[in-house]
UniProtKB/Swiss-Prot annotation:
GO terms for cellular component: cytoplasm. It comes from Haemophilus ducreyi (strain 35000HP / ATCC 700724). Its main location: cytoplasm. SUPFAM superfamilies: MurCD N-terminal domain, MurD-like peptide ligases, catalytic domain, MurD-like peptide ligases, peptide-binding domain. ATP binds at residues 125-131. It is an enzyme of class 6 (ligase). Belongs to the MurCDEF family. Cell wall formation. Pfam families: Mur_ligase, Mur_ligase_C, Mur_ligase_M. One of its GO terms (biological process) is cell division. Pathway: Cell wall biogenesis; peptidoglycan biosynthesis. One of its GO terms (molecular function) is UDP-N-acetylmuramate-L-alanine ligase activity. This is UDP-N-acetylmuramate--L-alanine ligase.
Length: 475
Protein backbone atom coordinates (compact mmCIF):
# COMPACT_ATOMS: atom_id res chain seq x y z
CA UNK A 1 0.00 0.00 0.00
CA UNK A 2 1.38 3.40 -0.97
CA UNK A 3 2.01 5.91 1.79
CA UNK A 4 0.81 9.50 1.91
CA UNK A 5 4.37 10.48 0.96
CA UNK A 6 4.27 8.26 -2.16
CA UNK A 7 1.05 9.91 -3.29
CA UNK A 8 1.78 13.56 -2.49
CA UNK A 9 2.63 14.54 -6.08
CA UNK A 10 -0.63 13.04 -7.27
CA UNK A 11 -2.41 15.17 -4.68
CA UNK A 12 -0.99 18.34 -6.25
CA UNK A 13 -1.87 17.85 -9.93
CA UNK A 14 -1.65 21.61 -10.50
CA UNK A 15 2.14 21.35 -9.99
CA UNK A 16 2.56 18.51 -12.49
CA UNK A 17 4.39 20.81 -14.93
CA UNK A 18 6.92 21.83 -12.28
CA UNK A 19 10.09 19.80 -12.69
CA UNK A 20 12.87 21.96 -11.28
CA UNK A 21 12.53 24.49 -8.45
CA UNK A 22 15.30 27.08 -7.99
CA UNK A 23 15.88 28.86 -4.66
CA UNK A 24 17.69 32.21 -4.52
CA UNK A 25 19.22 32.35 -1.05
CA UNK A 26 18.87 28.62 -0.47
CA UNK A 27 21.18 28.65 2.57
CA UNK A 28 18.69 30.57 4.71
CA UNK A 29 16.96 28.62 7.48
CA UNK A 30 13.43 28.95 6.09
CA UNK A 31 14.46 28.46 2.46
CA UNK A 32 16.61 25.39 3.07
CA UNK A 33 13.82 23.64 4.96
CA UNK A 34 11.33 24.04 2.13
CA UNK A 35 13.97 23.02 -0.40
CA UNK A 36 14.73 19.84 1.55
CA UNK A 37 11.07 18.84 1.80
CA UNK A 38 10.54 19.38 -1.95
CA UNK A 39 13.75 17.52 -2.75
CA UNK A 40 12.49 14.55 -0.76
CA UNK A 41 9.15 14.77 -2.57
CA UNK A 42 11.04 14.09 -5.79
CA UNK A 43 11.41 17.54 -7.35
CA UNK A 44 14.69 18.62 -8.90
CA UNK A 45 16.11 21.35 -6.66
CA UNK A 46 18.72 23.95 -7.50
CA UNK A 47 19.71 27.01 -5.54
CA UNK A 48 22.27 29.71 -4.96
CA UNK A 49 23.76 31.57 -2.04
CA UNK A 50 26.62 33.98 -1.55
CA UNK A 51 28.61 31.65 0.70
CA UNK A 52 28.97 27.91 1.15
CA UNK A 53 27.73 26.64 4.51
CA UNK A 54 26.89 23.45 6.37
CA UNK A 55 23.34 23.91 5.09
CA UNK A 56 24.30 24.19 1.41
CA UNK A 57 26.67 21.23 1.73
CA UNK A 58 23.89 19.15 3.30
CA UNK A 59 21.50 20.00 0.46
CA UNK A 60 24.16 19.22 -2.14
CA UNK A 61 24.80 15.85 -0.51
CA UNK A 62 21.04 15.19 -0.62
CA UNK A 63 20.96 15.81 -4.38
CA UNK A 64 20.37 19.54 -4.85
CA UNK A 65 22.42 21.48 -7.39
CA UNK A 66 24.06 24.31 -5.45
CA UNK A 67 25.69 27.44 -6.87
CA UNK A 68 27.87 29.77 -4.80
CA UNK A 69 27.25 33.29 -6.03
CA UNK A 70 24.31 34.72 -7.95
CA UNK A 71 24.47 34.45 -11.75
CA UNK A 72 21.75 34.57 -14.40
CA UNK A 73 22.75 31.19 -15.80
CA UNK A 74 22.07 29.50 -12.44
CA UNK A 75 18.34 29.38 -13.18
CA UNK A 76 18.75 27.25 -16.32
CA UNK A 77 16.02 24.60 -16.43
CA UNK A 78 13.97 26.10 -13.59
CA UNK A 79 10.17 25.90 -13.74
CA UNK A 80 9.79 28.36 -10.86
CA UNK A 81 12.13 30.57 -8.82
CA UNK A 82 11.63 30.95 -5.06
CA UNK A 83 13.14 33.99 -3.33
CA UNK A 84 13.62 34.98 0.29
CA UNK A 85 12.78 38.46 1.55
CA UNK A 86 16.51 39.12 1.99
CA UNK A 87 17.09 39.05 -1.80
CA UNK A 88 17.09 42.35 -3.70
CA UNK A 89 14.82 42.80 -6.74
CA UNK A 90 17.84 43.53 -8.96
CA UNK A 91 19.40 40.13 -8.23
CA UNK A 92 20.60 38.76 -11.61
CA UNK A 93 18.75 35.47 -11.14
CA UNK A 94 15.45 37.25 -10.49
CA UNK A 95 16.02 39.53 -13.48
CA UNK A 96 16.80 36.53 -15.70
CA UNK A 97 13.74 34.62 -14.48
CA UNK A 98 11.42 37.53 -15.20
CA UNK A 99 12.93 37.97 -18.67
CA UNK A 100 12.35 34.27 -19.35
CA UNK A 101 8.77 34.50 -17.97
CA UNK A 102 9.58 32.03 -15.22
CA UNK A 103 7.34 32.60 -12.16
CA UNK A 104 9.15 34.27 -9.24
CA UNK A 105 7.44 33.62 -5.91
CA UNK A 106 8.02 34.26 -2.22
CA UNK A 107 9.14 31.49 0.11
CA UNK A 108 5.76 31.53 1.88
CA UNK A 109 3.92 30.94 -1.40
CA UNK A 110 5.82 27.69 -1.89
CA UNK A 111 5.24 26.74 1.74
CA UNK A 112 1.52 27.36 1.16
CA UNK A 113 1.55 24.83 -1.70
CA UNK A 114 3.24 22.25 0.52
CA UNK A 115 0.54 22.92 3.12
CA UNK A 116 -2.39 22.87 0.72
CA UNK A 117 -3.29 19.18 0.91
CA UNK A 118 -2.08 18.51 4.44
CA UNK A 119 -3.47 19.01 7.92
CA UNK A 120 -1.26 21.98 8.68
CA UNK A 121 -0.31 23.90 11.82
CA UNK A 122 1.36 27.32 11.54
CA UNK A 123 3.26 28.92 14.43
CA UNK A 124 3.50 32.72 14.33
CA UNK A 125 4.64 35.45 16.71
CA UNK A 126 7.51 37.84 17.33
CA UNK A 127 9.32 35.43 19.66
CA UNK A 128 9.22 31.70 20.36
CA UNK A 129 8.16 30.50 16.89
CA UNK A 130 11.15 28.27 16.25
CA UNK A 131 11.14 26.59 19.66
CA UNK A 132 7.36 26.07 19.68
CA UNK A 133 7.48 24.60 16.15
CA UNK A 134 10.29 22.27 17.22
CA UNK A 135 8.37 21.16 20.33
CA UNK A 136 5.24 20.45 18.30
CA UNK A 137 7.26 18.47 15.76
CA UNK A 138 8.70 16.28 18.50
CA UNK A 139 5.30 15.75 20.18
CA UNK A 140 3.75 14.56 16.91
CA UNK A 141 6.78 12.37 16.25
CA UNK A 142 6.58 10.86 19.75
CA UNK A 143 2.89 10.13 19.11
CA UNK A 144 3.87 8.10 16.02
CA UNK A 145 2.34 10.58 13.57
CA UNK A 146 5.56 11.25 11.57
CA UNK A 147 4.76 14.88 10.65
CA UNK A 148 6.34 16.93 7.92
CA UNK A 149 7.94 19.96 9.53
CA UNK A 150 9.59 23.12 8.23
CA UNK A 151 11.29 25.16 10.93
CA UNK A 152 13.34 28.36 11.00
CA UNK A 153 16.04 26.71 13.09
CA UNK A 154 17.57 23.36 13.91
CA UNK A 155 15.36 20.84 15.70
CA UNK A 156 18.12 19.27 17.78
CA UNK A 157 16.32 16.00 18.46
CA UNK A 158 15.91 15.46 14.71
CA UNK A 159 19.30 16.90 13.73
CA UNK A 160 17.73 19.07 11.01
CA UNK A 161 15.29 21.92 10.47
CA UNK A 162 12.97 20.14 8.02
CA UNK A 163 11.59 16.67 7.47
CA UNK A 164 9.21 15.07 4.98
CA UNK A 165 6.89 12.86 7.00
CA UNK A 166 4.70 10.01 5.80
CA UNK A 167 1.52 11.36 7.41
CA UNK A 168 -0.86 14.16 6.46
CA UNK A 169 0.36 16.42 9.29
CA UNK A 170 2.54 19.45 8.61
CA UNK A 171 3.96 21.84 11.22
CA UNK A 172 5.60 25.05 10.03
CA UNK A 173 7.02 28.28 11.37
CA UNK A 174 5.13 31.25 9.91
CA UNK A 175 7.24 34.31 9.10
CA UNK A 176 5.74 37.71 9.84
CA UNK A 177 8.88 39.68 8.91
CA UNK A 178 7.63 40.45 5.38
CA UNK A 179 3.93 39.69 6.04
CA UNK A 180 4.21 36.76 3.63
CA UNK A 181 2.53 34.46 6.16
CA UNK A 182 -0.71 35.78 4.70
CA UNK A 183 -0.20 33.24 1.90
CA UNK A 184 -0.65 30.39 4.40
CA UNK A 185 -4.01 28.73 5.01
CA UNK A 186 -3.46 26.35 7.92
CA UNK A 187 -6.01 24.33 9.86
CA UNK A 188 -4.64 25.54 13.18
CA UNK A 189 -2.54 28.60 14.04
CA UNK A 190 -0.52 29.55 17.11
CA UNK A 191 0.34 33.15 18.00
CA UNK A 192 2.95 33.35 20.76
CA UNK A 193 3.19 37.16 21.09
CA UNK A 194 3.09 40.34 19.01
CA UNK A 195 5.62 43.16 19.41
CA UNK A 196 7.03 45.86 17.12
CA UNK A 197 9.70 44.31 14.90
CA UNK A 198 10.43 44.42 11.16
CA UNK A 199 8.49 47.68 11.22
CA UNK A 200 9.67 48.73 7.74
CA UNK A 201 7.34 46.00 6.42
CA UNK A 202 4.41 47.65 8.18
CA UNK A 203 5.23 51.25 7.32
CA UNK A 204 6.30 51.89 10.91
CA UNK A 205 2.68 51.41 11.99
CA UNK A 206 2.11 48.90 14.80
CA UNK A 207 -1.67 49.05 14.25
CA UNK A 208 -1.10 47.84 10.69
CA UNK A 209 0.97 44.96 12.06
CA UNK A 210 -1.90 43.95 14.36
CA UNK A 211 -4.31 44.09 11.41
CA UNK A 212 -2.07 41.77 9.40
CA UNK A 213 -2.06 39.25 12.27
CA UNK A 214 -5.86 39.31 12.32
CA UNK A 215 -5.90 38.64 8.56
CA UNK A 216 -3.47 35.76 9.08
CA UNK A 217 -5.76 34.20 11.69
CA UNK A 218 -8.83 34.73 9.51
CA UNK A 219 -7.13 32.52 6.91
CA UNK A 220 -8.16 29.64 9.17
CA UNK A 221 -11.26 27.77 7.96
CA UNK A 222 -14.42 28.39 9.98
CA UNK A 223 -13.77 25.08 11.76
CA UNK A 224 -10.14 25.98 12.46
CA UNK A 225 -8.55 26.86 15.79
CA UNK A 226 -6.39 29.76 16.97
CA UNK A 227 -4.16 28.99 19.97
CA UNK A 228 -3.16 32.33 21.49
CA UNK A 229 -1.01 33.46 24.41
CA UNK A 230 -3.08 34.87 27.27
CA UNK A 231 -0.02 36.60 28.76
CA UNK A 232 0.42 38.91 25.77
CA UNK A 233 -1.81 41.99 25.89
CA UNK A 234 -1.69 42.59 22.14
CA UNK A 235 -2.55 38.97 21.32
CA UNK A 236 -5.54 39.16 23.66
CA UNK A 237 -6.52 42.54 22.17
CA UNK A 238 -6.90 41.06 18.69
CA UNK A 239 -8.46 37.74 19.82
CA UNK A 240 -12.08 39.01 19.62
CA UNK A 241 -11.48 40.09 16.01
CA UNK A 242 -10.42 36.65 14.78
CA UNK A 243 -13.88 35.19 14.19
CA UNK A 244 -12.65 31.65 14.79
CA UNK A 245 -12.52 29.45 17.87
CA UNK A 246 -9.77 30.66 20.22
CA UNK A 247 -8.02 28.66 22.94
CA UNK A 248 -5.62 30.55 25.23
CA UNK A 249 -2.60 29.47 27.27
CA UNK A 250 -0.20 31.07 29.72
CA UNK A 251 0.44 32.06 33.33
CA UNK A 252 -2.62 34.33 33.20
CA UNK A 253 -5.36 33.18 35.59
CA UNK A 254 -7.90 33.37 32.74
CA UNK A 255 -5.94 31.12 30.36
CA UNK A 256 -7.68 27.96 29.13
CA UNK A 257 -4.40 26.06 29.60
CA UNK A 258 -2.98 27.66 32.74
CA UNK A 259 0.60 27.35 33.99
CA UNK A 260 1.11 27.07 37.76
CA UNK A 261 4.06 26.60 40.14
CA UNK A 262 6.91 27.11 37.67
CA UNK A 263 10.31 26.31 39.18
CA UNK A 264 13.75 26.15 37.62
CA UNK A 265 17.03 24.52 38.62
CA UNK A 266 19.82 25.02 36.12
CA UNK A 267 18.57 23.98 32.69
CA UNK A 268 15.53 22.12 34.06
CA UNK A 269 12.13 23.69 34.57
CA UNK A 270 9.02 22.00 35.93
CA UNK A 271 5.46 23.18 36.37
CA UNK A 272 1.81 22.15 36.24
CA UNK A 273 -0.68 22.89 33.46
CA UNK A 274 -4.36 23.15 34.41
CA UNK A 275 -6.36 22.10 31.34
CA UNK A 276 -9.87 23.37 30.43
CA UNK A 277 -11.46 20.26 31.98
CA UNK A 278 -9.41 20.87 35.19
CA UNK A 279 -7.08 17.98 34.35
CA UNK A 280 -3.62 18.65 35.83
CA UNK A 281 -0.50 17.78 33.83
CA UNK A 282 2.95 17.92 35.42
CA UNK A 283 5.49 19.08 32.83
CA UNK A 284 9.28 18.65 32.99
CA UNK A 285 11.44 20.64 30.56
CA UNK A 286 15.18 20.55 30.00
CA UNK A 287 15.23 24.02 28.49
CA UNK A 288 15.17 26.90 30.98
CA UNK A 289 13.00 29.95 31.47
CA UNK A 290 9.40 31.09 31.80
CA UNK A 291 9.40 31.79 28.06
CA UNK A 292 10.10 28.13 27.31
CA UNK A 293 7.29 27.10 29.66
CA UNK A 294 5.03 29.29 27.51
CA UNK A 295 6.37 27.74 24.30
CA UNK A 296 5.87 24.24 25.68
CA UNK A 297 2.35 25.01 26.87
CA UNK A 298 1.41 26.36 23.44
CA UNK A 299 2.57 23.05 21.97
CA UNK A 300 0.78 21.11 24.70
CA UNK A 301 -2.48 22.98 24.07
CA UNK A 302 -2.32 22.24 20.33
CA UNK A 303 -1.60 18.58 20.95
CA UNK A 304 -4.40 18.22 23.51
CA UNK A 305 -6.89 19.92 21.20
CA UNK A 306 -5.81 17.54 18.41
CA UNK A 307 -6.36 14.48 20.60
CA UNK A 308 -2.77 13.43 21.23
CA UNK A 309 -2.27 11.30 24.35
CA UNK A 310 -0.81 12.85 27.50
CA UNK A 311 2.02 10.31 27.66
CA UNK A 312 3.31 11.31 24.23
CA UNK A 313 3.04 15.03 24.99
CA UNK A 314 4.84 14.85 28.34
CA UNK A 315 7.52 12.43 27.11
CA UNK A 316 8.33 14.61 24.09
CA UNK A 317 8.59 17.75 26.22
CA UNK A 318 10.79 16.00 28.80
CA UNK A 319 13.09 14.72 26.05
CA UNK A 320 13.15 18.00 24.12
CA UNK A 321 16.77 19.02 23.54
CA UNK A 322 16.05 22.54 22.39
CA UNK A 323 16.23 24.37 19.09
CA UNK A 324 19.50 25.42 17.54
CA UNK A 325 21.00 28.57 19.06
CA UNK A 326 18.29 28.90 21.72
CA UNK A 327 20.15 29.03 25.08
CA UNK A 328 22.54 26.53 23.52
CA UNK A 329 25.29 25.34 25.91
CA UNK A 330 28.67 25.17 24.17
CA UNK A 331 30.50 23.81 27.20
CA UNK A 332 32.37 24.59 30.39
CA UNK A 333 35.93 25.80 29.94
CA UNK A 334 38.96 26.34 32.16
CA UNK A 335 40.50 29.75 31.56
CA UNK A 336 43.46 31.49 33.25
CA UNK A 337 41.15 33.24 35.74
CA UNK A 338 38.80 30.31 36.41
CA UNK A 339 36.15 28.02 34.95
CA UNK A 340 33.33 29.53 32.88
CA UNK A 341 30.17 28.30 31.11
CA UNK A 342 29.53 29.46 27.52
CA UNK A 343 25.99 29.78 26.12
CA UNK A 344 25.02 30.69 22.53
CA UNK A 345 21.64 32.37 22.01
CA UNK A 346 19.94 33.71 18.88
CA UNK A 347 17.79 36.31 20.67
CA UNK A 348 18.25 39.72 19.07
CA UNK A 349 15.12 41.63 20.14
CA UNK A 350 15.05 43.34 23.58
CA UNK A 351 12.27 41.05 24.81
CA UNK A 352 14.18 37.93 23.76
CA UNK A 353 17.32 39.21 25.47
CA UNK A 354 15.34 39.99 28.64
CA UNK A 355 13.90 36.47 28.93
CA UNK A 356 17.33 34.95 28.28
CA UNK A 357 18.86 37.02 31.08
CA UNK A 358 15.94 36.10 33.36
CA UNK A 359 16.42 32.39 32.64
CA UNK A 360 20.15 32.69 33.38
CA UNK A 361 19.51 34.57 36.64
CA UNK A 362 16.90 32.06 37.78
CA UNK A 363 18.87 28.93 36.91
CA UNK A 364 22.33 30.10 37.97
CA UNK A 365 21.73 32.57 40.78
CA UNK A 366 25.32 32.69 41.98
CA UNK A 367 26.96 33.24 38.61
CA UNK A 368 28.02 36.57 37.18
CA UNK A 369 26.49 37.13 33.73
CA UNK A 370 28.90 38.28 31.04
CA UNK A 371 27.12 39.10 27.78
CA UNK A 372 28.72 39.40 24.35
CA UNK A 373 26.12 41.22 22.27
CA UNK A 374 26.09 41.77 18.52
CA UNK A 375 23.25 44.09 17.44
CA UNK A 376 21.42 42.83 14.34
CA UNK A 377 20.43 45.45 11.75
CA UNK A 378 20.76 49.21 12.09
CA UNK A 379 17.01 49.66 11.59
CA UNK A 380 16.16 47.42 14.55
CA UNK A 381 18.77 49.18 16.69
CA UNK A 382 17.25 52.54 15.76
CA UNK A 383 13.62 51.48 16.27
CA UNK A 384 14.22 49.78 19.64
CA UNK A 385 17.20 51.82 20.85
CA UNK A 386 15.91 52.71 24.34
CA UNK A 387 14.71 49.15 24.93
CA UNK A 388 18.16 47.81 24.02
CA UNK A 389 19.81 50.29 26.40
CA UNK A 390 17.58 49.21 29.28
CA UNK A 391 17.82 45.45 28.78
CA UNK A 392 21.57 45.38 28.12
CA UNK A 393 22.07 47.27 31.39
CA UNK A 394 20.77 44.22 33.29
CA UNK A 395 23.89 42.08 32.86
CA UNK A 396 26.99 42.24 35.06
CA UNK A 397 29.52 42.67 32.25
CA UNK A 398 28.76 43.72 28.67
CA UNK A 399 30.98 43.27 25.62
CA UNK A 400 29.52 44.98 22.56
CA UNK A 401 30.41 43.97 19.00
CA UNK A 402 29.72 46.14 15.96
CA UNK A 403 26.26 46.01 14.39
CA UNK A 404 25.73 43.10 12.02
CA UNK A 405 24.28 45.04 9.09
CA UNK A 406 22.49 42.16 7.31
CA UNK A 407 22.75 44.15 4.07
CA UNK A 408 21.59 47.48 5.51
CA UNK A 409 23.42 50.78 5.23
CA UNK A 410 24.66 52.36 8.46
CA UNK A 411 22.25 54.68 10.27
CA UNK A 412 23.58 57.63 12.26
CA UNK A 413 23.21 57.20 16.05
CA UNK A 414 22.02 53.61 15.62
CA UNK A 415 25.39 51.89 15.89
CA UNK A 416 27.24 50.09 18.68
CA UNK A 417 29.13 53.19 19.78
CA UNK A 418 25.85 55.02 20.35
CA UNK A 419 24.47 52.06 22.31
CA UNK A 420 27.60 51.90 24.47
CA UNK A 421 27.44 55.62 25.17
CA UNK A 422 23.79 55.50 26.26
CA UNK A 423 24.28 52.35 28.36
CA UNK A 424 27.27 53.96 30.08
CA UNK A 425 25.26 57.10 30.79
CA UNK A 426 22.59 54.97 32.49
CA UNK A 427 25.27 54.06 35.00
CA UNK A 428 24.55 50.37 35.64
CA UNK A 429 27.23 48.73 33.49
CA UNK A 430 30.28 50.01 31.62
CA UNK A 431 30.22 48.33 28.17
CA UNK A 432 33.39 47.29 26.37
CA UNK A 433 33.29 47.86 22.60
CA UNK A 434 35.20 45.24 20.59
CA UNK A 435 35.22 46.18 16.91
CA UNK A 436 38.03 43.78 16.02
CA UNK A 437 36.53 40.35 16.69
CA UNK A 438 39.95 38.70 16.49
CA UNK A 439 40.59 40.28 19.91
CA UNK A 440 37.45 38.84 21.51
CA UNK A 441 39.17 35.89 23.20
CA UNK A 442 41.91 38.12 24.60
CA UNK A 443 39.39 40.64 25.95
CA UNK A 444 37.36 37.87 27.58
CA UNK A 445 40.41 36.38 29.30
CA UNK A 446 41.14 39.78 30.82
CA UNK A 447 37.69 40.25 32.35
CA UNK A 448 36.18 36.84 33.13
CA UNK A 449 36.18 35.47 36.66
CA UNK A 450 35.74 31.99 38.05
CA UNK A 451 32.14 30.69 37.79
CA UNK A 452 31.06 33.26 35.16
CA UNK A 453 28.22 32.48 32.74
CA UNK A 454 29.01 33.92 29.31
CA UNK A 455 26.03 34.63 27.04
CA UNK A 456 26.84 35.16 23.36
CA UNK A 457 23.75 36.96 22.10
CA UNK A 458 22.64 37.88 18.58
CA UNK A 459 21.43 36.77 15.16
CA UNK A 460 24.42 37.72 13.00
CA UNK A 461 27.73 35.88 12.77
CA UNK A 462 28.29 35.94 16.53
CA UNK A 463 27.50 32.22 16.74
CA UNK A 464 30.30 31.44 14.31
CA UNK A 465 32.69 33.62 16.34
CA UNK A 466 31.63 32.04 19.62
CA UNK A 467 31.88 28.46 18.36
CA UNK A 468 35.38 29.17 17.07
CA UNK A 469 36.18 30.55 20.53
CA UNK A 470 34.84 27.35 22.11
CA UNK A 471 37.04 25.26 19.78
CA UNK A 472 40.10 27.30 20.72
CA UNK A 473 39.32 27.00 24.43
CA UNK A 474 38.78 23.25 24.10
CA UNK A 475 42.17 22.73 22.44
Amino acid sequence: MKSYQDNIKKLVPEMRRVKQIHFVGIGGAGMSGIAEVLLNEGYQISGSDIVESIVTKHLADAGAKIFIGHQAENIAGASVVVVSSAIEENNPEITAAKSARIPVIQRAQMLAEIMRFRHSIAVAGTHGKTTTTAMLSMIYTEAGLDPTFVNGGLVKSAGKNAHLGASRYLIAEADESDASFLHLQPMLSVVTNIEPDHMDTYGGDFEQMKTIYVKFLRNLPFYGLAVMCADDDVVMEIAPQVGRQVISYGFNANADYRIENYQQTGFQGHYTVICPNNERLDVVLNVPGHHNALNATAALAVAKEEGIANDAILAALADFQGAGRRFDPLGTFKRPNGTVMLIDDYGHHPTEIAVTIKAARQGWQHKRIVMIFQPHRYSRTRDLFDDFVNVLSKVDVLIMLDVYAAGENAIVKADSKALCRSIRNLGKVDPILVSDTSQLGEVLDQIIQDNDLILAQGAGNISKLTRKLAEDWQA
